[in-house]
């Protein structure tokens, strides 16, 4: 099976404050509630199509990659920090409203983009009618029962990203790496090829392919998690937030228990998807879409 993404109804670029650009793609129903949707560190929004395809019949879906990811040309210098990602998200929300008009809007964000959306909403301002956060890998404060586990997890990811292979002769090489990865074993059929197509670009020197998000940038984001101080209560936001985690009972899960703890301690509307890991939207896309729409309906948005 191979996923074929639909042609967007509209594409446009958003210029960021340092000259970098983000490519926006508009899918779904133009008359529907607006959804802004993005991805996790080192991934790309197109690769989440197994999930967001289920939202297209009802919603106006704007899909985008954060800087140095996906369809965007890598920035030089990269300015690949959470502080910059927060500024970028503010620019995205402003420009989308300026170009397409104001209407009910929800944000749907996974992992890195989820943390960015949380930080943006608390430190910059609430720009949404609702937020849906998939498994943001937040660090609890020092002394918390799961702090050491999460700290070790982020350090392992940082080391892994620094050593990650950057270049590939073909897209299929990376797709096969994903198929052989234990972490990607539960992805739906076709997702491994889609992910490889989404995170690679042709090498500027014409020799094969390379990761759009280079390993140094990916490692930087993992390392910055240690100092974000992001463990907010749901009441810290200016509107309704849904927290959806991976299965906290899965063997070896770290982000699952972390989100379960955040949900309980922070008073969130929290759910988890059984038998999933961190890429839950690609492992059980229909279940994730169902939870999304049910929450949006409770908010009067579906």
Regions found by a protein language model. Name each.
Residues 17, 66-108, 290:
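Active-site loop/oxyanion-hole signature of alpha/beta-hydrolase fold enzymes
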Residues 2-21:
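N-terminal cap/lid segment of alpha/beta-hydrolase-fold proteins
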Residues 276-285:
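Catalytic histidine-centered segment of alpha/beta-hydrolase-like enzymes
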Residues 23-74:
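Conserved HGGG/HGGXW glycine-rich cap/lid loop of the alpha/beta-hydrolase fold
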Residues 103-146:
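Conserved hydrolase catalytic core segment
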């Amino acid at each position: 099976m191979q996923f074929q993404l639909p042609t967007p109804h509209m594409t446009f670029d958003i210029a960021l404050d340092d000259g970098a650009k983000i490519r926006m793609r508009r899918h779904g129903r133009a008359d529907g509630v607006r959804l802004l949707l993005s991805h996790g560190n080192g991934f790309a929004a197109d690769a989440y199509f197994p999930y967001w395809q289920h939202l297209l019949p009802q919603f106006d879906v704007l899909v985008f990659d954060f800087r140095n990811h996906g369809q965007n040309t890598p920035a030089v210098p990269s300015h690949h920090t959470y502080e910059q990602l927060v500024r970028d998200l503010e620019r995205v929300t402003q420009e989308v409203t300026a170009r397409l008009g104001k209407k009910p809007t929800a944000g749907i964000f996974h992992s890195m983009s989820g943390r960015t959306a949380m930080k943006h909403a608390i430190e910059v301002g609430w720009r949404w009618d609702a937020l849906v956060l998939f498994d943001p890998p937040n660090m609890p404060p020092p002394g918390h029962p799961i702090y050491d586990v999460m700290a070790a997890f982020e350090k392992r990811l940082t080391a892994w990203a620094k050593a990650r292979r950057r270049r590939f002769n073909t897209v299929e090489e990376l797709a096969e790496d994903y198929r052989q990865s234990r972490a990607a074993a539960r992805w739906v059929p076709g997702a491994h090829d889609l992910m490889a197509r989404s995170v690679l670009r042709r090498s500027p020197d014409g020799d094969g392919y390379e990761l759009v998000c280079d390993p140094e940038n990916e490692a930087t984001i993992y390392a910055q998690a240690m100092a974000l101080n992001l463990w907010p209560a749901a009441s810290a936001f200016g509107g309704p937030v849904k927290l959806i985690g991976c299965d906290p009972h899965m063997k070896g899960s770290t982000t699952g228990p972390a989100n379960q703890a955040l949900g309980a301690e922070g008073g969130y509307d929290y759910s988890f998807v059984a038998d999933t890991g961190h890429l839950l939207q690609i492992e059980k896309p229909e279940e994730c879409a169902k939870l999304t729409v049910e929450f949006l309906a409770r908010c009067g948005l579906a």
